[in-house]
Every structure is written in C-alpha cells, then in structure tokens.
C-alpha cells in the first residue's frame, strides 16, 4: 500500500532538513525505508507476488545508491542516518 500524506509528512518532519524538505538524501532514504518495510511485510503474506518482489529490489537498490552518495559527501551524516533508521550497514 502506498504511503499516505500524513505518513510522508511525519517522516519528512523527522528526517528532513526543514519542514518542506523532500529532496535531501536523508528524507529520500527515510521514505524509501518505510516503503521497503511495507513491501517486506506484504511479501511475508504473499510469497508468490514476484512483481512486488522486483519492485522491492529496485527500491533497495535506489536506497543503496542514495546511502552511498551520502557516505561520499559526509560520513558523519551517513552514520547518523543509518543509526537513526536502524539499518544494517
């Protein structure tokens, strides 16, 4: 299921650099992480939904590239983001 506007606003308020921030890597990674978590739960129930599995893999790849970018720009921002999101890295 897609993220609701309220969920997006809450996530962007927590991880964005300011209230209307949608473009910073931190905000994008946080939104992708929520979508990945939702898709993971969906796939636990619907094991044979291969179209959604491919979408999940694409989202994970996009998040990985954004995290790599943040790590290249500022390692401390990267470490803080990974810790706040609870990612294994």
From Swiss-Prot:
Keywords: Ribonucleoprotein, Ribosomal protein, RNA-binding, rRNA-binding
GO CC aspect terms: cytosolic small ribosomal subunit
Molecular function GO labels: rRNA binding; structural constituent of ribosome
Classification via InterPro entries: Ribosomal_uS15, Ribosomal_uS15_bac-type, uS15_NS1_RNA-bd_sf
Keyword Protease: no
Coiled-coil zones: none
Pfam families with a match to the protein in the record: Ribosomal_S15
Quaternary assembly: Part of the 30S ribosomal subunit. Forms a bridge to the 50S subunit in the 70S ribosome, contacting the 23S rRNA.
Family: Belongs to the universal ribosomal protein uS15 family.
Job of this protein: One of the primary rRNA binding proteins, it binds directly to 16S rRNA where it helps nucleate assembly of the platform of the 30S subunit by binding and bridging several RNA helices of the 16S rRNA.
Matching HAMAP family: Ribosomal_uS15_B
Protein name: Small ribosomal subunit protein uS15
Gene (UniProt): rpsO
């Amino acid at each position: 299921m897609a993220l609701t506007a309220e969920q997006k606003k809450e996530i962007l308020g927590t991880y964005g650099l300011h209230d209307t921030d949608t473009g910073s890597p931190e905000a994008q990674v946080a939104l992708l992480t929520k979508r990945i978590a939702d898709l993971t739960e969906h796939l636990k129930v619907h094991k044979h939904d291969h179209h959604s599995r491919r979408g999940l893999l694409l989202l994970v790849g996009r998040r990985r590239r954004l995290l790599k970018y943040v790590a290249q720009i500022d390692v401390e921002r990267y470490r803080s983001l990974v810790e706040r999101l609870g990612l294994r890295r």
